[in-house]
């Protein structure tokens, strides 16, 4: 037990006083300027409803003998980076949550924002079929709330991803005790990941992180991307 305890103490001390391999200066030392490095970072957390897909490489093109010698499908190795994917399709209830949130925040001052986000329900109409009930009820009726949302354009999908990134990161900061919930957000006084990182949004602060930079004169600071707390953009 004593041996294990000694190893833990030595390990923690070595991490605490780890130095830069290119300058020799200690990390996380306010006496040396306070350059902070997340030494105990393991891996990125998986966002709500996502699953991790490990990347790899595969051969694209001809994989068998070219009998006719056409050489019109030359094989090449393609590398795919690791990425995250939703466990299921985005449901109607998920998109309705998005519509509700942006209407609550921007509906009075910028109603065009809410209108621009509405999916095209007319995609159900077909000359050879009677799909009018889907046009009228598919998006909003509770019977279809767990069905995949349809009629969403590429631009709308990107806006949805930005909104989802902001909501996930805001909840992370609240769960970490850094921010408090603010139900009165409206217009430009709304949490946005990019705005928060560049100092254009503060929110209702609860307890910020310890600041190791003596030049600022502040004991606490906001979260930075280098801290590994916030998730990258969806």
Regions found by a protein language model. Give the residues of each.
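Short Gly/Pro-enriched turn/cap motifs at secondary-structure boundaries
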Residues: 41-42, 74-75, 149
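Extracytoplasmic
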Residues: 48, 55, 75, 80-82
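N-terminal pre-domain segments of enzymes
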Residues: 16-46
């Amino acid at each position: 037990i004593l041996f294990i305890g000694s190893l833990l103490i030595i390990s923690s001390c070595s991490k605490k006083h780890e130095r830069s391999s290119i300058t020799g200066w200690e990390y996380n030392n306010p006496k040396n300027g306070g350059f902070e490095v997340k030494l105990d970072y393991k891996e990125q957390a998986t966002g709500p409803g996502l699953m991790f897909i490990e990347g790899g490489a595969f051969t694209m093109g001809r994989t068998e003998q070219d009998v006719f010698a056409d050489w019109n499908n030359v094989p090449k190795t393609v590398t795919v980076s690791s990425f995250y994917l939703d466990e299921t399709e985005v449901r109607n209830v998920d998109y309705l949550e998005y519509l509700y949130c942006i209407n609550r925040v921007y509906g009075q001052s910028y109603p065009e924002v809410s209108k621009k986000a509405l999916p095209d329900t007319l995609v159900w109409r077909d000359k050879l079929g009677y799909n009018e009930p889907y046009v009228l009820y598919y998006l909003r009726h509770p019977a279809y709330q767990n069905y995949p949302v349809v009629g969403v354009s590429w631009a709308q999908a990107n806006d949805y991803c930005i909104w989802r990134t902001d909501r996930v990161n805001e909840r992370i900061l609240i769960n970490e005790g850094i921010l408090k919930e603010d139900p009165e957000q409206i217009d430009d006084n709304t949490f946005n990941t990019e705005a928060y990182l560049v100092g254009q949004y503060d929110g209702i602060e609860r307890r910020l992180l310890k600041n190791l930079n003596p030049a600022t004169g502040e004991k606490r600071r906001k979260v930075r991307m280098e801290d590994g707390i916030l998730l990258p953009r969806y």
